[in-house]
Amino acid sequence: MLWLALGPFPAMENQVLVIRIKIPNSGAVDWTVHSGPQLLFRDVLDVIGQVLPEATTTAFEYEDEDGDRITVRSDEEMKAMLSYYYSTVMEQQVNGQLIEPLQIFPRACKPPGERNIHGLKVNTRAGPSQHSSPAVSDSLPSNSLKKSSAELKKILANGQMNEQDIRYRDTLGHGNGGTVYKAYHVPSGKILAVKVILLDITLELQKQIMSELEILYKCDSSYIIGFYGAFFVENRISICTEFMDGGSLDVYRKMPEHVLGRIAVAVVKGLTYLWSLKILHRDVKPSNMLVNTRGQVKLCDFGVSTQLVNSIAKTYVGTNAYMAPERISGEQYGIHSDVWSLGISFMELALGRFPYPQIQKNQGSLMPLQLLQCIVDEDSPVLPVGEFSEPFVHFITQCMRKQPKERPAPEELMGHPFIVQFNDGNAAVVSMWVCRALEERRSQQGPP
């Protein structure tokens, strides 16, 4: 019998939970779960995978009080299901009724012949390696510009990163493009971040995305998040990257300028590096700027794969609030559009709020186009007088010029007095600030 732990609801922390996994046309399997740590969505999928080894399940359903099926695809939806179930259990206990198991229904899976079954990975190269056994390495693939094309083919074809080797732990965040998990890579013993994106695309487009992602192995910058690999399972792409224990900047409060300056230096260096490789980031915003307790700052989620960018845009409808005016208007996009996004991001981090007060970002950065028309029609926002240094005010003002060609070029950004002032390599300033902020957050949350 399989035993796991569960305990997100204090009143039920000693209550044994029985989950009844309904198997189509074959009855059911009962799974006993004891109290303890919070049960994750991935844990349930793992158990369903043991019950239905011939199928790939990406979601499951439960029935509400009206008998309607509710789909669970994330940890948040998992919590909602458990909350609903425990409320019914409490009612059953009060009324002296027999406690019924929590019944879940794995979503109908495609027949094996329609699934991607080659190591749970879409190979971008044909040949014998497609059917070879996955290689097990002592560590995750490192980033190096010296990697040959043959090495890249091997990494993409030998299944070095695949679903079977990953154990999902905590949910780090939900974005408009998918869900990010903290995960454990079994062969290497490394902690990594895995972004899982649901995409309704063909096998050919999956292969194209995997091919386009090859360039990430060439990125060798301390200001760019480390890339370990990617794989498809059904209609989910999982992108495996370096784990940053400080998380993304969007979850932090208003930042002091001496910290903001050193973070800005790292972001500008990261963008300059990408631009030198002819890569536009396309999605510069605080949630794509990551920090760790060592004081490092790194960019993530840049648009190296045009097909992936387009597929996400078709799947997750909306317009990014950090887009430059010309992008919102549907005009040509270039480096200067990244520069606008840089400016509005650091203006938000300095103010502790989004610079356009009429735009509320409570539900993330994607929103209907009409709400963002003010970015196109109105003058650029300005920082309040007297609160910030002249170099910082000038830096933001230049980045947020309405005309793209009036914004600084890459070399002008690096030479700007604000960037020069804080380009001292003092990571300790960022490290102390991140550690203090994380400690304050833990103290506010109280004991686990």
From Swiss-Prot:
Pfam families: PB1, Pkinase. The modification Phosphothreonine is found at residue 315. Expressed in many adult tissues. Abundant in heart and skeletal muscle. The active site is at 283 (proton acceptor). Interacts with PARD6A, MAP3K3 and MAPK7. Forms a complex with SQSTM1 and PRKCZ or PRKCI. (Microbial infection) Interacts with Yersinia YopJ. Binds MAP3K2/MAP3K3 and MAPK7 via non-overlapping residues of the PB1 domain. This domain also mediates interactions with SQSTM1 and PARD6A. This is Dual specificity mitogen-activated protein kinase kinase 5. It comes from Homo sapiens (Human).
